[in-house]
C-alpha cells in the first residue's frame, strides 16, 4: 500500500475566477488535469455551498469537489470569501510508481487557481519501514 499524498494550501486566489465558485468549471478543470496527468477518474462529486449569513445571499460561495481515481483520490475545497483553496492528491504506488503523475496533477491545479502563495506538503505513505514496525 505504498503511495504519495500531496497537499497544497493556496492563498490569494482571485474570488471572481469561475474555478473558485462554479462547480461545472471546477469539475472540468479537475477532470482535464487528471487525464493530462495520466491518471484514471472512476467517479466524482462536486458540491456548491449555499450562500447565507454573515456574507449575504449574493456572496460567492465555495465548492468541495472529489474525484475518485483508480489510483486513489483528488479533493478540492474553495473559499472565495477568503480567496483560498486547498488541494489533496493521493496516489497508490502498488502496481506502478504514480508519484510523477501526482506531482503533475497538483501542479496543473495550482496553475488553474493562480494563487499568490502556495504551501505544499508531501507524505510518503505505507513505507516498508512502517510495515516492519508493526
Residue map of PLM features:
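Polybasic/polar functional segments that serve as interface/processing modules
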Residues: 1-134
Amino acid at each position: 500500500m505504498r503511495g504519495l499524498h500531496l497537499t497544497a494550501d493556496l492563498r490569494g486566489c482571485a474570488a471572481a475566477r469561475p474555478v473558485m465558485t462554479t462547480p461545472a468549471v471546477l469539475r472540468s478543470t479537475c477532470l482535464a488535469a487528471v487525464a493530462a496527468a495520466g491518471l484514471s477518474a472512476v467517479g466524482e462529486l462536486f458540491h456548491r455551498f449555499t450562500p447565507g449569513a454573515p456574507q449575504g445571499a449574493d456572496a460567492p460561495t465555495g465548492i468541495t469537489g472529489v474525484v475518485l481515481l483508480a489510483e486513489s483520490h483528488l479533493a478540492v475545497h474553495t473559499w472565495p470569501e477568503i480567496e483560498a483553496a486547498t488541494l489533496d492528491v493521493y496516489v497508490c504506488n502498488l502496481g506502478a510508481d504514480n508519484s510523477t503523475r501526482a506531482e503533475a496533477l497538483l501542479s496543473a491545479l495550482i496553475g488553474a487557481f493562480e494563487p499568490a502563495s502556495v504551501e505544499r506538503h508531501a507524505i510518503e505513505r505505507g513505507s516498508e519501514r512502517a510495515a516492519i514496525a508493526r
